Design a protein with these regions (language model features):
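His/Asp/Glu-enriched, well-ordered alpha-helical/loop segment
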Residues: 32-36, 97-100, 109-192
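Short aromatic-centered micro-motifs
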Residues: 206
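Short glycine-/small-residue-rich flexible loop motifs, especially phosphate/cofactor-binding loops
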Residues: 27, 47, 69, 117-118, ...
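Short, small/polar residue-rich loop motifs at catalytic or cofactor-binding pockets
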Residues: 199-201
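Small/polar (Gly/Ser/Thr/Ala-rich) solvent-exposed segments
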Residues: 195
Length: 217
């Protein structure tokens, strides 16, 4: 937790929670053990601290400014923007029991989300796909549309969820593309997602290790 969160009633997303030294030590120890480090980071100060500490990816990055976007691009730090979760929470949060104070924070920070994401695209920050929501099934499919609305092409959004996610996790030897020798894990949709990315919300079937596990019903 490089910063506080948004959809909780207590913490402040603008405040750096761990010190620079604590983050650097956590990253050092994790990397020594061969693990990746992802930092929850909303506010600008915490984002920059996490980048300096050497994390592999920034989760959310909602207040990414020009300087931090440049830092990420220069250091090869990934961004997992989770665009849809904030948009969804603002629509459903109160009905799910979110505190009014949390909703107020969400309304404030969602205004930062679009400009921050466009800065990441401007500086060619590496972007991988991810979600962060109570309604995980919906978020997984609708994040594609949010990425495209945010400025990505449909192809870039698909790559974020496939080869780029695999590269971030150093799993691209086995995952991320369809080619001989890799795991046969993929989904099928009714039409070409390059023409309409929202078809990713309508999966026809899922294949896992070469076996169809979710046929069209």
């Amino acid at each position: 937790m490089a910063t506080g969160g948004v959809m909780d009633p207590i913490s402040d997303y603008r405040v750096q929670e761990l010190s620079d030294a604590q983050m650097a030590r956590a990253v050092e120890d994790a990397h020594r053990a061969g693990h990746k480090v992802m930092a929850h980071a909303e506010g600008t100060v915490g984002i920059k601290a996490a980048i300096r500490a050497g994390v592999d990816s920034i989760e959310h990055g909602t207040m990414l400014d020009e300087e931090s976007a440049k830092m990420m691009a220069e250091r090869g730090t990934w961004l997992v923007p989770t665009l849809y979760c904030f948009q969804h929470d603002l629509k459903t949060g109160l009905s799910k029991g979110r505190e009014p104070s949390s909703m107020a924070k969400g309304i404030a920070i969602v205004k930062e989300q679009g400009p921050a994401f466009r800065r990441a695209l401007k500086y060619h920050v590496k972007i991988a796909y991810g979600v962060d929501d109570d309604d995980i099934d919906e978020s997984v499919s609708k994040e594609f549309g949010a990425l495209v609305q945010g400025g990505m092409t449909p192809l870039e959004a698909l790559q974020a969820a496939t080869i780029h996610g695999a590269e971030l996790l150093s799993l691209d030897k086995d995952l991320g593309t369809i080619e001989p020798g890799k795991f046969a894990d993929f989904v099928a949709v009714p039409t070409n997602p390059l023409d309409d990315i929202t078809v990713m919300e309508h999966v026809a079937w899922v294949m896992k290790s070469g076996v169809v596990v979710k046929p069209l019903s």
